[in-house]
């Protein structure tokens, strides 16, 4: 059996961290989302076909050389069904399909017991997903894509949703070939599922344990926390005197931790990172390759991507910081509202409540001057510069230059 993983989309709801990388390549617990998915299935399939599109080179370069993996380029993103159809000439038997942004704990083996099956997850907000209703013997009897509250009340009693994992027979390719485009002008995989439902050929498998469709920035941190709970400690690198390390911490070769720094696991610090002196790395933090956290800086519950520098007297909490950033002295990410309500983020023009504590989302190659403060939920686009003494309380588009124009008054004392 083979597998198809859908990796071609651009992930606009996760801007700015997807401005320069495909969503499946966002690092979670030290490795891309896509690598976590591949590790879940690679021992159960012969070939894995990655359908790539947006920033495809980043996926191809990372996984090139893995004999089990082949790449299929979807030049135009014409829907999930079209992406699956791209694999028709490569696959001769039954196959798995997985969305390239889904993290799941459940074992994939149960899917192999069915001819056609869809993974299901129970959620509190089914209106954000495709809702599925099960009948006798776990057969799927209805599917409604992102229903509103009235549709849920009138048509469904289910809070089971499509979890983005499928086992399909080969004839599904024929169904996909004969589908008409949706209102969005795309060939939808869910329309093929509806054809299977009409002929009573689709079963639902409720997933056990953790599941997360990585669609919004706080989903990234949630998945990061999930994986960090299960790491085993391994300390390498150059650890100087008077460094305190507690909990489960992974420090790779090539890391330097200067004296009087404190690291509280779970934490992963990748090769080439430089920590301290007097740095404080708090739980649920991942520092990717060649990062720098300097004197008296504190990082908590955050992902800091490759080659980013947070040199001194700064605080980064519950945030996602892109690669190649450089923070000036005393750069602060606020992560809590006075009213203790969930932090609100702007997602594609709509204000969406996230979680109680959430900091900032910073794109790649962002530079801040001294004493820059970022309010909870703020996003800063890639290649932007924020000048000294700025309080950033709104989203900043990529390629922006932000500065505050104060007038300095100088008078003689007498």
UniProtKB/Swiss-Prot annotation:
Region (Linker): 209-228
Name this polypeptide is given: Bifunctional protein GlmU
Annotated active site: 312 (proton acceptor)
Pathway in which this enzyme or protein is active: Nucleotide-sugar biosynthesis; UDP-N-acetyl-alpha-D-glucosamine biosynthesis; N-acetyl-alpha-D-glucosamine 1-phosphate from alpha-D-glucosamine 6-phosphate (route II): step 2/2; Nucleotide-sugar biosynthesis; UDP-N-acetyl-alpha-D-glucosamine biosynthesis; UDP-N-acetyl-alpha-D-glucosamine from N-acetyl-alpha-D-glucosamine 1-phosphate: step 1/1
Native source organism of the sequence: Methanococcus vannielii (strain ATCC 35089 / DSM 1224 / JCM 13029 / OCM 148 / SB)
Similarity field: In the N-terminal section; belongs to the N-acetylglucosamine-1-phosphate uridyltransferase family.
InterPro entries: Bifunctiontional_GlmU_arc-type, GlmU-like, Hexapep, NTP_transferase_dom, Nucleotide-diphossugar_trans, Trimer_LpxA-like_sf
Superkingdom of origin: Archaea
Top EC class of this enzyme: transferase
Role noted for this protein: Catalyzes the last two sequential reactions in the de novo biosynthetic pathway for UDP-N-acetyl-glucosamine (UDP-GlcNAc). Responsible for the acetylation of GlcN-1-P to GlcNAc-1-P, and for the uridyl transfer from UTP to GlcNAc-1-P, to produce UDP-GlcNAc and pyrophosphate.
EC id: 2.7.7.23, 2.3.1.157
Region (Pyrophosphorylase): 1-208
